[in-house]
Structures are given as C-alpha cells and as structure tokens.
Amino acid sequence: MRVLIKNGIVVNADGQAKQDLLIESGIVRQLGTDISPQLPCEEIDASGCYVFPGGVDVHTHFNIDVGIARSCDDFFTGTRAAACGGTTTIIDHMGFGPNGCRLRHQLEVYRGYAAHKAVIDYSFHGVIQHINHAILDEIPMMVEEGLSSFKLYLTYQYKLNDDEVLQALRRLHESGALTTVHPENDAAIASKRAEFIAAGLTAPRYHALSRPLECEAEAIARMINLAQIAGNAPLYIVHLSNGLGLDYLRLARANHQPVWVETCPQYLLLDERSYDTEDGMKFILSPPLRNVREQDKLWCGISDGAIDVVATDHCTFSMAQRQQISKGDFSRCPNGLPGVENRMQLLFSSGVMTGRISPERFVELTSAMPARLFGLWPQKGILAPGSDGDVVIIDPRQSQQIQHRHLHDNADYSPWEGFTCQGAIVRTLSRGETIFCDGTFTGKAGRGRFLRRKPFVPPVL
C-alpha cells in the first residue's frame, strides 16, 4: 500500500515545510517537493492544510470499572473516537485489579479488552495498587515486556503512603520505568467532603470545593520531594489543573529534577462555573475544574514550555449513569469526562489559531513529547523516513461547531457541546491507512497493534 500526500504543510516539532509525504507499507519513506513515485499509489491533495504526526494520547481510561460503574467506552468505541479526532496512538491507564493481584494480572485483562477491538495502536501504563516484595520484583520483568511507565495514586481506594511511594519510585527508577502519579491529598479531601455531606451540601459545586487546588498542589510538592529522596527518580504528573502545582514543578525544573507534567483541554477551556449549571453533574471529574485565573496560568505553561503534554484523561460515564448512581450527591457520582475525539481540534483552535502556540509546539504537546517520554520515539510522534505513517490532516480554513450527535464515542453528551472550533480534522491515517475521512469513520475493529515500549530515557530538559 502506497500513499502520497501532496501540497500540504508538513509539521514536526522542530520545523515545518510545504512538501510531499510518501508512505509505503505503513512507513514514511520520503519527504520532499514534487515526489514522483515509481509505482502506483493513492494520492491525497492536502493543499492549504497542515499535515501533522498522528496524535499520541497518553491518558485514557477505556472499559474501566470504578466499582460503582463501568465506563461506557470500550476499546472499540474509545479508539474509534480517538481516530476520528486525529489521534493514532493511545496509552491507557489500566484500572485497579482484585485486591492483592500481581501486575501481570491487569496487563493480561487489558490486552484481552483491546485485542479484537482497538482501531489504533495502543499500550498501557501499569498500575501499582499495593507494595510488597513480589510486586517490586515483578517491575523489571514488566519493563522487559514493554510497559515502561507505572501509575501511583495518592487518593482513592488503593492510595499509597509515603513509604510505599518511596519504594515504588526507587524500583521503577532502577528498572528503567517512568513513575506517573495522580496527586491529591486524600486526607484533606476526605475531611472536606465529610464536612459538606454532614451539612447536606451535595450539589455538584461542592465537588470542586471538597478538592481545592491546595490538595493537588501539596501532593505535587510532596511527590517532587519524595522523588528527590528516592535518588532523583523521574516523575510525571498527570492532569494538572492549577498554577500553584505548576509553580512547584517550575522550581523542581530549575533545580534540574527530571519532572514532567501533562494537562488536559478541560482545565484549559472549562471552568468551575460549569458546576452551577442545570447539568453540573456531568462535569464531575478529579481534580475538578478550576477558575479562569488558573486557566490563564496553565496557558502560560503551555506557551512557555513548562507544560510538556496535553492528554485527555478520557473516562466516559453517561448522564444516565451519573444521575442514577449519584441521585444528586456529588460524592456518589462516577468521575470523568469524554474528550479523546476533541483534544487535537480544541488545542489547534484555541492554541495555534489564536497565536498562543506555534504549529510546531502543537506537535510537541500532542505527539512528539508524549512519544519521547513513553518509549515510542521515533516510531511515533514524528513524520520522518522510518517512522510509522500516522498522520492527521487539519484544514485551518474550516470552522466546526462541536455537537455530540456528530461524535463517535459511546457517551450521551459532550462537555464541549456548542464550542466552535477554527480548524477541522479532515483525514486521519494510521500506518498509511485512512481510518477517518471528511466526517466518516473508515477503520475497523482489531486493526490496532499492541506497542511494546522502550525503557524510559529522559528527554533533554
């Protein structure tokens, strides 16, 4: 199979040029002007469009069971939505397994979930839900099998204490793995939540008030210090929602600590006023939406390079699930928002088209740095000879209004309903195969491949 993309502006993290792109057998073979292939091929005219590396979303939750509910996107509907939004690779955060289970247990479960359903290429982050000698001894074997990142939680059912975190940080560092962490102070949250519930204050806005930004920022600072104590272990902070936490990360970077951070479109474009709407329960996620001032601080981090990655934390529960389970009580509502289909378009529209970031910085945030950090570079995250032919073509001249009825996930709403975006995703190619074109999904379940990722190598800070 040969595909020639002509007349587009090909953009990588280190530059852009108007040139053609030739893909053969799923691999980029040539970039240049006026490429004339010797053999017949499909030609795609990208005149006036940007040709970007396919998106790499390193934070999704497909088919996750959170105890009170199972998310409504599995690995088919979730990756279908990703493909239609220009994302060609996902790394899914596996959910918790049975109490006392080994690391391999969840890997086998999740490979079963994805094997015959994933539309695009995929991998998983390991999840460490308890610490003992067997778990610590298993980590190097998991890294050898291609899982080079693991998640720790400082809140929820399987939160780790500081001693357990230190043990995990040390062993992950020694084994060539990157530690990722959900940082919130669980004790402080529990205290605030109990206070509100006792007073009968259970409306959605009290979800945000029960998880103030200081709970997140304190946990970020604590993880930075613990990583330093653990031998300067590399650390990746997921779903940053506030500027104080970013300040702590800037300080760590100034002290040459190997720390990286992601944020998500919801923290850049939605704010806490959503909780006071009639459908406020559909915006319940953790950490919660913040105020506009915190948004501005995050945009500064996007613009100046302090934030490394924009992912989604896609975790979809329908409004029917939310209403039936919560019965109006924020503390009972399953947490998470859909968004895997909208990430690329939202950041392109609100970032590139407003002049906040360059097209090159867009690539850095959405594909290049995610691929570097998580052991996929240069197979993913770049359009260069030898890399996978994963491509998203965006037409900056088109304007689109987001409406859930046109999306491809399995939710029954979108938090982005009514948002108008400048720039439209017109085609997505995965390993040279068109899987989305002009509003129509053209891929198929099961074509996605499991990616064995390389051990962690820190990008230059």
Curated annotation (Swiss-Prot):
Cysteine pairings via disulfide bonds: none
Record-listed E.C. numbers: 3.5.2.-
GO terms under biological process: pyrimidine nucleobase catabolic process
Family per similarity comment: Belongs to the metallo-dependent hydrolases superfamily. Hydantoinase/dihydropyrimidinase family.
Record's comment on post-translational modification: Carboxylation allows a single lysine to coordinate two divalent metal cations.
Protein name (record): D-phenylhydantoinase
Upper classification of the organism: Bacteria, Pseudomonadati, Pseudomonadota, Gammaproteobacteria, Enterobacterales
Organism, scientific name: Escherichia coli O81 (strain ED1a)
InterPro entries: Amidohydro-rel, D_phenylhydantoinase, Hydantoinase/dihydroPyrase, Metal-dep_hydrolase_composite, Metal_Hydrolase, Metallo-dep_Hydrolases_sf
This protein's GO CC annotations: cytosol
Modification sites for N6-carboxylysine: K151
Record gene name: hyuA
Residue numbers binding substrate: Y156, S286, N335
PANTHER family in the record: COLLAPSIN RESPONSE MEDIATOR PROTEIN, HYDRANTOINASE/DIHYDROPYRIMIDINASE FAMILY MEMBER
Cofactor binding comment, as recorded: Binds 2 divalent metal cations per subunit.
